[in-house]
Amino acid sequence: MIRIDELLRAYRKGLFPMADPDDEKVYWCQPYKRAVVPLLSYMPSRDVARILRRGEFEVRIDSDFEGVIRGCAAPRKSDSQTWISPEIMDAYLTLNQLGVAHSVECWHHGELSGGLYGLSMGAAFFGESMFFRRSYASQVAFDHLVRRLKDRGYLLLDAQIMNPHLQKLGAVEIDHDEYMLQLDIALGKKIRFI
């Protein structure tokens, strides 16, 4: 079982948990290069902007956190394994109940169509995972997250490990020292996600 105090302390030190898909053992990760999304320069893609204009999704916050984390943990077409073990899931469900972990959800005709979840600490948001069941749902949730973080004065959106999808969303890589500097500044501020 992951202790909540240890989990929060790890995030403050630049670490985050991932479970081995084969044995579900939890490891602490601290990549040398960190993916972050520069909040001020973020722009949605044309396709996402079009979807936003059409209002295809209802965006909600924390109305089905468990549904989002389960959606993120479900096997994907490209990969049948997940780093979100039951132990990690339980820890984040507790963090949601404590008001630290949050979900941004896209709903279409009453169905959860996609979303993301992460942790809010100070002026930092640690994005953990996203999923979609309907095209563009996770990207609309991401756009809503970025706008919310900008509006509230957040300084850091940590995307953890770069991948092609994050790169399309505007993430860039920074080295560990720069990340820790940004993290320290962001943790020094008090901002509420909700």
UniProtKB/Swiss-Prot annotation:
Domain of life (superkingdom): Bacteria
The keyword ATP-binding appears for this protein: no
Catalytic activity entry: N-terminal L-lysyl-[protein] + L-leucyl-tRNA(Leu) = N-terminal L-leucyl-L-lysyl-[protein] + tRNA(Leu) + H(+); N-terminal L-arginyl-[protein] + L-leucyl-tRNA(Leu) = N-terminal L-leucyl-L-arginyl-[protein] + tRNA(Leu) + H(+); L-phenylalanyl-tRNA(Phe) + an N-terminal L-alpha-aminoacyl-[protein] = an N-terminal L-phenylalanyl-L-alpha-aminoacyl-[protein] + tRNA(Phe)
Pfam families named among the record's database cross-references: Leu_Phe_trans
Localization annotation: Cytoplasm
SUPFAM superfamilies: Acyl-CoA N-acyltransferases (Nat)
InterPro entries referenced in this protein's UniProt entry, alphabetically: Acyl_CoA_acyltransferase, Leu/Phe-tRNA_Trfase, Leu/Phe-tRNA_Trfase_C, Leu/Phe-tRNA_Trfase_N
The protein's Enzyme Commission number: 2.3.2.6
Coiled coil feature spans: none
Keywords: Acyltransferase, Cytoplasm, Transferase
Similarity field: Belongs to the L/F-transferase family.
Protein name: Leucyl/phenylalanyl-tRNA--protein transferase
Annotated organism of origin: Chlorobium phaeobacteroides (strain DSM 266 / SMG 266 / 2430)
Higher taxonomy: Bacteria, Pseudomonadati, Chlorobiota, Chlorobiia, Chlorobiales
